[in-house]
UniProtKB/Swiss-Prot annotation:
GO molecular function: chromatin binding; molecular adaptor activity
Region entry Disordered, spans: 29-110
Role description: PCNA-binding protein that acts as a regulator of DNA repair during DNA replication. Following DNA damage, the interaction with PCNA is disrupted, facilitating the interaction between monoubiquitinated PCNA and the translesion DNA synthesis DNA polymerase eta (POLH) at stalled replisomes, facilitating the bypass of replication-fork-blocking lesions. Also acts as a regulator of centrosome number.
Covalent cross-link Glycyl lysine isopeptide (Lys-Gly) (interchain with G-Cter in ubiquitin), where: K15, K24
One Pfam family here: PAF
Summary of subunit composition and partner proteins: Interacts (when monoubiquitinated at Lys-15 and Lys-24) with PCNA. Interacts with isoform 2/p33ING1b of ING1. Interacts with BRCA1.
Motif PIP-box: chain residues: 61-71
Protein name: PCNA-associated factor
Subcellular location: Nucleus; Cytoplasm, Perinuclear region
Biased composition (Basic and acidic residues): 71-80
Length: 110
């Protein structure tokens, strides 16, 4: 619905104004500059983020550096035959396209 001057009632329609968060006042007299006590608490207290539980690496697990250093020839992969790996179609015999025969059963029933 479009508002026109004919159906305008003063005070009935007010523009919505978004409220703002309160701003910090610089130079506040309540600001405490003594940080010697708070620095000790920061060392002992967990500051946030993802907690990490350090565990020893198992003997069977290889390092990430060894993974990047392996050449493609030396790496053992599940698909060892290059023709079977991937679906690029390289090295495969091309299949001939077989067009579908038109289905006339629907025409006969009508």
């Amino acid at each position: 619905m479009v508002r026109t001057k004919a159906n305008y009632v003063p005070g009935a329609y007010r523009k919505v104004v978004a409220s703002q968060a309160p701003r910090k006042v610089l130079g506040s007299s309540t600001f405490v500059t003594n940080s010697s006590g708070s620095s000790r608490k920061a060392e002992n207290k967990y500051a946030g983020g993802n907690p990490v539980c350090v565990r020893p690496t198992p003997k069977w697990q290889k390092g990430i550096g060894e993974f990047f250093r392996l050449s493609p020839k030396d790496s053992k992969k599940e698909n060892q035959i290059p023709e079977e790996a991937g679906s690029s179609g390289l090295g495969k015999a091309k299949r001939k396209a077989c067009p579908l025969q038109p289905d006339h059963r629907d025409d006969e029933n009508e």
